[in-house]
A protein has these predicted regions:
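Long, contiguous regulatory modules within eukaryotic nuclear regulatory proteins
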Residues: 1-67, 79
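Cysteine-centric segments in proteins
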Residues: 3-5, 12-13, 22-24, 86, ...
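Alpha-helical protein-protein interaction elements
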Residues: 11-14, 95, 255
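Generic structural hydrophobic/aromatic packing signal, biased to beta-strands
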Residues: 20, 49, 66, 83-86, ...
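Eukaryotic short linear interaction motifs
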Residues: 27-32, 42, 54-63, 71-75, ...
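Compact, glycine/acidic-enriched structural inserts
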Residues: 73-104
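A eukaryote-biased signal for long
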Residues: 109-264
């Protein structure tokens, strides 16, 4: 019994709302927009964390990119890399980053980066158990996982070990991390690494653009694994926070992936 209590001694250091979002591949300006049929048509997979102000979250929104275009498999304890694209105080900065974008290239002419599509909404926590940091979430939308969630590995709930990379250290092989765009931490926060390659204790390290991290699949039952009841709410199109808090426009961002789990 003592061993069981020790496993469940968990400190929640941050909680809030989480959204999963994908962006279709870039196309030429003169090409008609096509619906996404599967993960091969996905350019990038994002995760947005909005810490609740009462949990001490310094950044209102963190827009993150997850490598391999999907979450790590929890059953296989798979690991995927990621990095923080944007740290924003307003929803408008995030919605602008996720909107349709037109740009010119010298060799291929004008290109279009399609608007991102929401693929999941839920609640999350960052929690410490001993020297480990965990990211755990529970979905509120869609009600049932569809093809989108299955291919992006968005389970109804899951937990991951989270390690944040020291920008002053080299990257281990086969992580997908590199030195480009690395975070520039103030001296006080840089000391949190204590000359280690990764840190696992302080979520403030995620509040800097360019911060790089590793997610390792841990489990698919947060209550059993961490002793935390995430208490997701029943949401619908009318109550979804992604439209109220993140302020995504339904007219610009197809919502079928979020509500029905079908690709668009």
């Amino acid at each position: 019994m003592a061993e069981k209590k020790e496993r469940q001694r968990t400190e929640v250091v941050e909680h809030g709302n989480i959204w999963f979002i994908y962006r279709p591949k870039v196309r030429a300006e003169d090409e008609p927009e096509q619906d996404v049929d599967g993960i091969d048509d996905v350019e990038r997979f994002h995760m947005v964390l909005r810490p609740d102000a009462r949990s001490g979250g310094a950044a209102r929104f963190r827009l993150m990119t997850i490598g391999a275009k999907r979450l790590p498999d929890t059953g296989e304890h798979e690991r995927n890399w990621g990095f923080v694209d944007l740290v924003a105080k307003s929803a408008g900065q995030v919605t602008e980053a996720l909107g349709e974008d037109h740009y010119d290239t010298k060799t291929r002419g004008e290109r279009v980066r399609p608007a991102a599509r929401p693929a999941g909404e839920g609640v999350y926590v960052l929690a410490r158990t001993g020297s480990k940091m965990h990211l755990a979430y529970a979905l509120e939308l869609p009600d049932k996982p569809g093809p989108v969630q299955k291919q992006l590995n968005i389970e109804p709930e899951a937990s991951f070990a989270l390690s944040i990379k020291n920008p002053e250290k080299g990257s281990p092989r086969n992580t997908g991390l590199d030195s480009a765009g690395k975070a520039d931490y103030p001296e006080k926060l840089q000391k949190e690494f204590r000359d280690r390659r990764f840190a696992t204790e302080d979520p403030r390290l995620l509040d800097y653009e360019g911060a790089q991290f590793i997610l390792i699949g841990a489990g698919s039952d947060v209550k059993r694994d961490l002793g935390i009841d995430l208490e997701p709410e029943d949401e619908s199109e009318g109550t979804a926070d992604i439209f109220k808090q993140l302020r995504l426009s339904k007219g610009k961002h197809p919502i079928e992936p979020l509500l029905t789990g079908e690709w668009r």
